[in-house]
Every structure is written in structure tokens, then in C-alpha cells.
């Protein structure tokens, strides 16, 4: 019998965290973060982590598991999430993954890896081929393959392309999970207003100080590439004003939300629920009940 697993996904700021907590409380679950930035300690505001009170109400996993100057990849996520799922189930709880990092979620659910079944010489040859491309050419290649990334750098672009190319033929013998995918969405205007309001709320909560600490101590760390931090660095350097930097955060977040939706719709068989529907929570609740009953 396959392990039952619920995944709550969707664009940033749509309300995934609140729904995940509600489902965990109602269905005896624990939450695993499926967000590539929430793994970093001390970066709480810009990564929109669940609050201390929320984490106290429901156990959360894969949050605060890396120092800011450490790297984290889809491979790390698959390995660690797999262990957390097994541990949660062993304790008699329902694992619920909540997040919007499409590459991480797809890698876990479809069993992607670059392990022993892969021809490593072929991987190295492809890597050498990628190394001949400019950053612009790598970005264009990633875009054509509809790989969603936040603030990509050259190393992450190449790594994602390797995963995309070589994972196609090395899926496990079917996913080990019986998965219910729950997608949240909203009409574009309302979603963009949510995003803008959330950025304003983050600024009021102290995002500027959090970003300044990162700028002063770890200006070149992988963590700095998350939306909400990098946009403020030119302000700290005296190159742009604060208002312009904040607007850039909003703009980049809106663009990222659009890319997230494209990824989920094209690559994952997910049922979407509009948060503008007054009964969307009731519909999701019934879907979970039916899923757990079967």
C-alpha cells in the first residue's frame, strides 16, 4: 500500500500556509515545507515562514535546516523530505507538503534523481556543453524548458538543466506515494494585490533589517538570491531609492507567481481551487475526506 501524501501548492501569497495548517489540524497531520528559501535560519520575514505560533500549533519540518551560507538543492530536498515523510507516517500522522518550489515538488513526487542509474559520463559531457553557453543562453534554455527558478545564477541554471535532462529516464518504478495535489489560485488582479500587500506587510515587519543583515554578513550566499533580498542590495549600496527597491520586489514576485502557475499547470496534474470561491475550503475538505477514505 502506498503512503498517502497531501501536497498544497500554488503561487506565492495565495494562502498555502494557512490552508496547510488548517488541514493538518483537522486531519491529524504534520507539515513539510516545500519552499527552497524557508530552509535558511534567520531569514524569516522575506521567506514568509509560518510564525512561531503557527509552528507551535502544528509541527513543521524542513524549516531552518540550513545556515545562510550553505547551499541547498532539489536533491537535498528529495532526500530529506523522503525521510521526514517516513518519520511522520511512522508516528501515525498524515504528511502534508506545503510549498511553491515546483522543481522540488516534482522531483519528490515523480522520483527524480541523478543516482547510480545515470550515465555519469553523459552527465559530465552535458555539463561541459552547458559550460560553453553564456548566462543569457542558459537562461533562454531554462525558459524554453519551462523550468521555474527564483533569481537564478549560473550554477543553479546548469544544475536545473542537468536534472531536467537526466531525470526523464530515471524515474523510480512509479511514485511510492498516493498523492492528493491541492492547488490554490486566484484571479490575476486579486493575486497581484495580495502580493503587493504582503510585500508592504513584510517591510513593516522588518524585512529591511533582515536584508541588511544578509547584505552585511553574507552578500554572496545562495540565500541572497531569493526574492525580497537581492532587490534591496542596490538600495544598501546607495544606487537606488527604497521606494524603487520595494517596487522591484513586488514586480519580481508577481512575475515569479506567473511562472509558478505555468509550471504547475504544464507539469503537474493538479486540481486548482480559487480562493475567491466562498466555498473553496469546504470543497477541499471534502476532497481530502474522499482521498483518505479510499
Swiss-Prot record:
**Cofactor(s) this protein cannot do without:** Mg(2+)
Q: What EC number is given for this enzyme? A: 2.5.1.75
* A single MF term (Gene Ontology): ATP binding
Transferase as UniProt keyword: yes
Q: Which InterPro entries match?
A: Dimethylallyltransferase, IPT, P-loop_NTPase
**What NCBIfam families does this protein map onto?**
miaA
Protein name, as recorded: tRNA dimethylallyltransferase
- Gene name, please? miaA
